[in-house]
């Protein structure tokens, strides 16, 4: 594998930040293997995201959220040297879309931030969610919280914004690395998954609507 971008994205030992893994022998580890096997076999991505017979939706969603977090994290990591306070003073997706940060700690009101600052806060926030046993339980038999899908929708909507920013503001870097096809595959996988289970509002998908229509339909 000569492409340096691919080495980073698919090398399991190289991560932008600590990677959440599934414990061998657990139900979710088996689901993770099943999902990866479908992708590696070249199965149509629309089919690959469908819930396998006999599996629980929350388990399937949890596995994919962690996987998407890891992949999007790495994609952003490869272009992050060109995403600076100066180049991207506002987290946006072109002139029409500005993304403001809000959380339960320092930023209780939607706040305009630079893209790198927004990304930092976002990745930290998602990491806290997926490592919280009360939200993403790892033990089989431990129930998911009632608001699990609500939390997931927020995570995935915010991860989608990373795709928006990367495609609109940093695609030249992706092209320079010769990695368009591989980033596009990650995006298609993500898009098919969130639309299969209705995990992102249509209005959130609007910034990449034209590209998605060409790529995913």
UniProtKB/Swiss-Prot annotation:
Which Gene Ontology BP annotations are present?
A: signal transduction
**Annotated GO CC locations:** cytoplasm; nucleus
Residues holding Zn(2+)? 83, 88, 165, 170
Q: Which InterPro entries match?
A: MOB_kinase_act_fam, MOB_kinase_act_sf
Q: Which Gene3D superfamilies match?
A: MOB kinase activator
Q: Name one GO molecular function term.
A: metal ion binding
**Any keyword Nucleotide-binding?**
no
- The domain of life for this entry's organism is Eukaryota
Q: Which UniProt keywords apply?
A: Metal-binding, Zinc
Q: What does this protein do?
A: May regulate the activity of kinases.
Q: Tell me the protein family, please.
A: Belongs to the MOB1/phocein family.
In Swiss-Prot or TrEMBL terms, this protein is called MOB kinase activator 3A
**Which species is the source of this protein?**
Bos taurus
The major lineage groups are:
Eukaryota, Metazoa, Chordata, Craniata, Vertebrata
